[in-house]
Amino acid sequence: MAMWKKKKTPSILPLVVVIAAASLIAPTTAGWSSGTATFYGGSDASGTMGGACGYGNLYWSGYGTNTAALSSALFNDGASCGQCYQIACDHQAEPRWCLQGRTVTITGTNLCPPNYALSSNDGGWCNPPRTHFDMAEPAWLQIGIYKAGIVPVLYQRVPCVKQGGVRFTMGGFNYFELVLISNVAGSGSIQSVWVKGPNTDRMPLSRNWGANWQSHAGLVGQTLTFGVTSTGGQTLVFQNIVPAWWKFGQSFSSNLQFSY
């Protein structure tokens, strides 16, 4: 991968260039942070399917190709799954490889694991405490030049926009149910979940891995209601979203969606 180095900016610039640069400088004073980005998954992003959040086929689950694997500093042991980030290639730092004035909004769907065998500045891009996005190639190409390999970026967390309602996918087995909660708008990520059935008192679920929440109750054969609180602090109750005839592997979409 090509390396990037910060270049000196000429002291005298045409007015049009100064105006363009201002749009890139402004994010650093408005809650933007600095990081780096690479890409993976091929031109159709088929290599990004699955992943440490558990969303499976990202085409089918609504996440598409504007996705990224997050370094562990961002991934937060899976608590950041589903969060959305607006990313701009830092054209001031690396004008050779950045598309000026472009941004892309991605969803965190995977973990970019650390590689301690490599230096954090030479291949170990996802080593902590680096904030790094290993982006799906189609997302990367909206802000950077293919042969760059790695570029400096500016990023900020933004609200997620999704089509349709929150989706619940039932996995695991009886007395060890795994509930995948996906297609979450607003803050994109989940803080807490509870479940209640006609034969089961309301009980909290715990995060097992990624966006999968677990229950040790026998939920088979029950109509299930879920209460979900987003990391933005909004709580929605999905009344009887899962019918009594549900089977493991089935997904159920709601008509409710988070706004924050």
Curated annotation (Swiss-Prot):
Subcellular location: Secreted, Cell wall; Membrane
Function statement: May cause loosening and extension of plant cell walls by disrupting non-covalent bonding between cellulose microfibrils and matrix glucans. No enzymatic activity has been found. May be required for rapid internodal elongation in deepwater rice during submergence.
Tissue: Expressed in roots.
UniProt name for this protein: Expansin-A15
Membrane topology: Peripheral membrane protein
GO biological process terms held by the UniProt record: plant-type cell wall loosening
SMART domains given in the database record: DPBB_1
Chief site of localization: secreted
Pfam families hit by this protein: DPBB_1, Expansin_C
Keywords per UniProt: Cell wall, Cell wall biogenesis/degradation, Membrane, Secreted, Signal
Family statement drawn from the similarity comment of this UniProt entry: Belongs to the expansin family. Expansin A subfamily.
Record domain Expansin-like EG45: where: 50-165
Signal peptide bounds: 1-30
Transmembrane segments: none
